[in-house]
From Swiss-Prot:
Pathway: Amino-acid biosynthesis; L-lysine biosynthesis via DAP pathway; LL-2,6-diaminopimelate from (S)-tetrahydrodipicolinate (acetylase route): step 1/3. The lineage of its organism: Bacteria, Bacillati, Bacillota, Bacilli, Lactobacillales. NCBIfam families: DapD_Ac. Its EC number is 2.3.1.89. Catalyzes the transfer of an acetyl group from acetyl-CoA to tetrahydrodipicolinate. InterPro entries: DapH, DapH_N, Hexapep, Hexapep_transf_CS, Trans_hexapeptide_repeat, Trimer_LpxA-like_sf. The keyword Membrane does not apply. It comes from Pediococcus pentosaceus (strain ATCC 25745 / CCUG 21536 / LMG 10740 / 183-1w). GO terms for biological process: diaminopimelate biosynthetic process; lysine biosynthetic process via diaminopimelate. Keywords: Acyltransferase, Amino-acid biosynthesis, Diaminopimelate biosynthesis, Lysine biosynthesis, Repeat, Transferase. Belongs to the transferase hexapeptide repeat family. DapH subfamily. It is an enzyme of class 2 (transferase). It catalyses: (S)-2,3,4,5-tetrahydrodipicolinate + acetyl-CoA + H2O = L-2-acetamido-6-oxoheptanedioate + CoA. This is 2,3,4,5-tetrahydropyridine-2,6-dicarboxylate N-acetyltransferase.
Amino acid sequence: MSNLDTQSIINTISNSKKQTPVRVFIAGEKLYQLQIPNEIEAFISPTSGTLFGEWKYVKALLESSSQITHYRVENDSRNSAVPLLDKKEVNARIEPGAIIRDQVLIGNNAVIMMGAIINIGAEIGAETMIDMGVVLGGRALVGRHCHIGAGAVLAGVIEPASAQPVQIDDHVLIGANAVVVEGVHVGTGAVVAAGAVVTKDVPAHTVVAGVPAQIIKRVDNTTSQKTALEDGLRNL
């Protein structure tokens, strides 16, 4: 279970220092003469360079430095409350375009596909695949060896505030474009059909479908064969 409860996440966002980080490419003459403040990280040659830092400091430098004749600013957030996760040492496969915020836990050999959005406090178990375009809301908990299908949404706890997160147990398959609402617990080995809207707990080893989702049967051999996961996709 996550160490972050709902109020802790809300407090983290509310009290964090909001940031507008930028990367700026500059050109000019005698750039080595620039008076660069400590808040800005700079890589400079006499006629070109790159600056990294908070926009208010970089903006002030650009406006006050006659040595800079041209510049280009790259920026992808404004007053951001939570930074993105540093993915370099995560023992998982994370494809380009996945957006993962800080304070997310990702288990060994998990797979995060393109376009997935994973919010603060979420946990993803070992060997679980988060498919393309999935949204894991704040503090959503997903167990081991699951598949969360493309476009599925596991609701977060932040707004509206919910004391209990979505909890997906081990070996669960969530079909494409399914929605699991706040506080729902999906039991071990369950299957949620594509497009289902899950508004109440799902017992282990059952299949649910529909809007709202209803139990349609127990998981049997046929279901297990149709929903079997490919472990080779989880190799690193």
